[in-house]
């Protein structure tokens, strides 16, 4: 049990400096949250900020796909579930790469079985605790009041 806990927290930073969270918010799928996040990433990159794509839901939108060009992208974690391959954020790769800003699409996503956390927001919390800032997206229907 202790070994498992230590392995899961090997990238945890004792530094008081936590990452910042920037949320691109929208009312529905397809309104341009991911597009706006990628545009902001290019602007940050032009200012010399170390920014990396951790996970982007591609949705085969040509304009969105084009904005991925020129940005470093981490390989996605492939998880097999009921005979199909699912793509997830590779949290360990992100923590090891340690960019200033990491792009992580769909904050409200439920991770596949086999991932460290059941929800993507938990991945983001771990990244923030490690001092990595995160740009992410969320739709209003995923919020609770």
Each PLM stretch: what is its role?
Residues 18-96:
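Conserved P-loop
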Residues 89, 97, 119, 128:
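Catalytic, metal-anchored helix/loop core of enzyme active sites in primary metabolism
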Residues 1-17:
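Pre-Walker A adenine-sensing motif
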Residues 106-121, 139-140, 145:
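Conserved ATPase-coupling elements of RecA-like P-loop NTPase cores
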Residues 50, 98-101, 127-136:
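Loop/turn-to-beta-strand initiation segments
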């Amino acid at each position: 049990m202790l070994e498992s806990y230590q392995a899961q927290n090997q990238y945890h930073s004792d530094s008081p400096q936590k990452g910042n969270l920037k949320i691109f918010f929208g009312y529905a799928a397809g309104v341009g949250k991911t597009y706006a996040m990628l545009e902001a990433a290019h602007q940050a990159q032009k200012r010399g900020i170390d920014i990396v794509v951790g996970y982007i839901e591609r949705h085969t939108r040509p304009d969105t796909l084009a904005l991925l060009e020129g940005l470093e992208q981490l390989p996605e974690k492939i998880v097999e579930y009921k005979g199909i391959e699912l793509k997830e954020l590779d949290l360990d790769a992100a923590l090891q790469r340690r960019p200033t800003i990491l792009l992580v699409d769909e904050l409200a996503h439920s991770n596949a079985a086999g991932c460290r956390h059941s929800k993507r927001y938990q991945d983001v919390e771990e990244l923030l605790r490690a001092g990595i800032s995160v740009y992410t997206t969320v739709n209003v229907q995923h919020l609770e009041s």
